[in-house]
C-alpha cells in the first residue's frame, strides 16, 4: 500500500513517535517533502530546530515510513545533545538504534533496505542504451584504469 507523503502526515507521525520513543524531548523541526531518489530521508542540523526532509519518490508502507522518520529523529536527537558526530552513523547513532530495538522491538537500519521507487520517478533508459551498456561493459572494465592514468597525465 502506497502512502501519500505530506508535511502534515510526517508532522503527525513525528509527534506520535517523539512522544512514544523520545519522551517529547525533541523540538519539532521544519518538515519538508523532497524528491530525492537516492535517500529516503534527510536531517539537516541548521537553525534552532533543524530540518527533516522525507522523499516522496519511494513506495512506503507505514512501517517503512516510521523507520525513516525514526532514523532522522535519531540524528535530530544527537544534534540536539551537541554530539559532534550527530549527522553520521557512528557509535552514538548505533547506541540509539540499539536502545530503540531493545525497548520497542523496531530495527532501525543505518542505510535503508532496498525500497522501490515509484514508477513516475524511475529513470526511463531506452532499450538501445541498455543494449550498448551490456555490449560495451567488458571494455569499460578493461579501459577504466587507463582512463584514470590518462586523466592524471594530461
Spell out what each predicted region is.
Residues 2-64, 80-154:
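Metalloprotease/metallohydrolase-associated module, dominated by Zn2+-dependent proteases
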Amino acid at each position: 500500500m502506497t502512502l501519500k507523503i505530506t508535511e502534515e502526515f510526517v508532522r503527525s507521525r513525528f509527534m506520535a513517535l517523539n512522544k512514544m520513543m523520545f519522551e517529547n524531548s525533541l523540538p519539532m523541526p521544519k518538515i519538508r517533502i523532497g524528491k530525492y531518489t537516492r535517500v529516503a530521508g534527510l536531517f539537516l542540523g541548521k537553525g534552532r530546530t533543524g530540518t527533516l526532509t522525507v522523499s516522496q519518490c519511494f513506495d512506503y508502507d507505514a512501517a517503512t515510513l516510521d523507520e525513516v522518520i525514526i532514523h532522522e529523529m535519531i540524528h535530530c536527537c544527537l544534534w540536539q545533545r551537541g554530539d559532534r558526530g550527530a549527522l553520521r552513523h557512528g557509535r552514538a547513532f548505533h547506541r540509539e538504534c540499539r536502545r530503540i530495538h531493545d525497548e520497542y522491538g523496531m530495527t532501525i537500519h543505518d542505510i535503508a533496505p532496498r525500497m522501490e521507487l515509484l514508477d513516475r520517478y524511475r529513470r526511463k533508459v531506452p532499450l538501445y542504451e541498455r543494449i550498448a551498456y551490456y555490449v560495451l561493459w567488458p571494455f569499460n572494465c578493461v579501459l577504466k584504469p587507463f582512463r584514470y592514468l590518462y586523466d592524471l597525465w594530461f
